[in-house]
């Protein structure tokens, strides 16, 4: 069912008579603020797009009954603040995009999304997910995106946290446990260093660091790395030689990293 750009639609219809629906597109329904609870009855639904539903602030918990849902797009829902507590029940979910939302805290059940392969919170400037599940859900003590534990997302291959106002590299420590991760975008953030355990990512191929203007050093990176995008990393001063495996890789650095290369110093390791 394609209802995209129905700009006067304020509530979704009752879906109880179309339970065999596999795709539901509500992209660009800029007046939509309420989703009918019968959405949870769509047992065969595998694709749901609510992209750019600017008035949408929440979803009924029954959305987590969508056992076949594989792709869920919530990007551009700038007023959307909170996922249902049982979000982790979406056990078949492979892709979740929430770019530009106002999500503040991830439910603890998020760690149960073992099939999740693509996750994007680009432009969520916070204060989104807290690293401590026991903190008050309405806490206003955070001024930047603070990562929640992600270590159990063993299938995750692509993660975008660009422009999330991450200011402390230590909050990225949990990334070192994402054993399947291939593409990691941390561009446009405010951290000074990256955690050393990023070297534990055996399949990491692409690392995005563009416009991380406070970043001063790159630690050892996994040998699987193929591309480091670091344009406008104007404070970058030190790169571990071990990040590139050999002197040859260091000589060919310009093919792999884009930064003010003339003043970068290479070290045998960064503690």
Residue ranges and their predicted role:
Residues 1-144, 149-169, 174-271:
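Predominantly recognizes leucine-rich repeat
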